[in-house]
Swiss-Prot record:
<keyword id="KW-0677">Repeat</keyword>
<dbReference type="GO" id="GO:0003729">
    <property type="term" value="F:mRNA binding"/>
</dbReference>
<feature type="zinc finger region" description="C3H1-type 1">
    <location>
        <begin position="204"/>
        <end position="232"/>
    </location>
</feature>
<dbReference type="InterPro" id="IPR045877">
    <property type="entry name" value="ZFP36-like"/>
</dbReference>
<feature type="region of interest" description="Disordered">
    <location>
        <begin position="284"/>
        <end position="306"/>
    </location>
</feature>
<protein>
    <recommendedName>
        <fullName>mRNA decay factor CTH1</fullName>
    </recommendedName>
</protein>
<keyword id="KW-0863">Zinc-finger</keyword>
<keyword id="KW-0862">Zinc</keyword>
<comment type="function">
    <text>Binds to specific AU-rich elements (ARE) in the 3'-untranslated region of target mRNAs and promotes their degradation. In response to iron deficiency, promotes the decay of many mRNAs encoding proteins involved in iron-dependent pathways. Negatively regulates primarily iron-dependent mitochondrial processes including respiration and amino acid biosynthesis.</text>
</comment>
<dbReference type="GO" id="GO:0005634">
    <property type="term" value="C:nucleus"/>
</dbReference>
<dbReference type="InterPro" id="IPR036855">
    <property type="entry name" value="Znf_CCCH_sf"/>
</dbReference>
<dbReference type="GO" id="GO:0008270">
    <property type="term" value="F:zinc ion binding"/>
</dbReference>
<dbReference type="GO" id="GO:0000956">
    <property type="term" value="P:nuclear-transcribed mRNA catabolic process"/>
</dbReference>
<dbReference type="InterPro" id="IPR000571">
    <property type="entry name" value="Znf_CCCH"/>
</dbReference>
<dbReference type="Pfam" id="PF00642">
    <property type="entry name" value="zf-CCCH"/>
</dbReference>
<keyword id="KW-0479">Metal-binding</keyword>
<dbReference type="GO" id="GO:0006879">
    <property type="term" value="P:intracellular iron ion homeostasis"/>
</dbReference>
Length: 325
């Protein structure tokens, strides 16, 4: 039978931690140092064993003979219980308590313990599948089976209008009628017919009128024609100061020019051009101011056509008729 010992009797050999004095007795100083060094060795040993726990599980067959009994280590390295562990007097704690303390300090709170390294992949796969299921559940939307679209939200097609008329006639027992709305009479305004814009290829440089379009009213080339169809498409090009200042070689040698009015050179002399212009101006002035005599009065349609033709009084009439300006 052990004698009744006070619960704090084993603290007599160790200085009190709450004492005001910082000096320690010289008798027990060596014992405290040895005790602290042994505790450090135990902590280092358990930290190493915990870090190498996975490798020890893989090589369990080779490490069975090298395992050390926990009670033997406790009996050798801990002759006295530590003063900061809450325990009963003259009682020793197993090394499992140290192991739990070290694991709780070193391991994060959110991680799960993995005893078998090969089971880690299975745990990860199960976690991934559970997360996917959660996401699918969050994305799923419950559809109300009793939901029906309102009749007025349907598109206005012939079938839907017939359905609406049938539904309303069945519900009210009366034929479907639209609500009467007050409308104000608008005075009819006269609008000019909209002219569709003709497709015009603006890349072409149209500086001349199309003969077939101006005479016949149509052109077989359409908007691909290189000539202007109307004055709105006609473009004026800038003429240089040397335009038609030199005589045309074809005109002087042959008496005509195949280019006609497109030729950039002068057809005939300056005097010929002046006479031709004066003749046209004099004819237009005479016809506008002086009336025709009774002897030359038009008796028939043929006479009217003959009088309407211009007369050239110049000697080289054929040459002037070939001139096109």
């Amino acid at each position: 039978m052990m004698p009744n010992v006070a619960p704090n009797s084993y603290y007599l050999n160790i200085p009190n931690a709450n004492s005001t004095s910082t000096t320690t007795s010289s008798i027990f100083s060596d014992l405290n140092k040895e005790y602290e060094s042994k505790i450090k060795e135990i902590e280092e040993y358990y930290i190493k064993t915990l870090l190498n726990e996975n490798t020890d599980n893989d090589d369990s067959s080779s490490s069975e003979g090298h395992n050390i009994n926990e009670t033997d280590i406790l009996s050798e390295y801990s002759p006295r219980p530590s003063p900061w562990l809450p325990s009963k007097p003259n009682c020793y704690h197993p090394l499992g308590d140290f192991k739990d303390l070290i694991i709780s300090d070193s391991r994060p709170t959110n991680t799960l313990p993995i005893n078998n390294p090969f089971a880690g992949n299975n745990n990860i796969s199960t976690l991934a599948t559970t997360e996917k299921k959660r996401k699918k559940r969050s994305l799923e939307v419950e559809i109300n089976p009793t939901y029906t679209t309102s009749a007025f939200s349907l598109p206005l097609t012939a079938e839907n209008l017939q359905k609406l008329s049938q539904v309303d006639s069945q519900s009210t027992g009366l034929p479907y009628t639209l609500p009467i709305q007050k409308t104000t009479k608008l005075e009819p305004c006269r609008r000019a017919p909209l002219q569709l814009p003709q497709l015009v290829n603006k890349t072409l440089y149209k500086t001349e009128l199309c003969e077939s379009f101006t005479i016949k009213g149509y052109c077989k080339y359409g908007n691909k024609c290189q000539f202007a169809h109307g004055l709105n498409e006609l473009k004026f090009k800038k003429k240089s100061n040397n335009y038609r200042t030199k005589p045309c070689i074809n005109w002087s040698k042959l008496g005509y020019c195949p280019y006609g009015k497109r030729c950039c050179f002068k057809h005939g002399d300056d005097k010929d051009v002046e006479i031709y212009q004066n003749a046209n101006d004099g004819r237009s002035k005479d016809t506008a101011l002086t009336p025709l005599p009774t002897s030359l009065a038009p008796s028939n349609n043929d006479n009217i056509t003959n009088l309407s033709k211009p007369r050239n009084l110049h000697t080289s009439v054929k040459a002037l008729q070939r001139m096109t300006w």
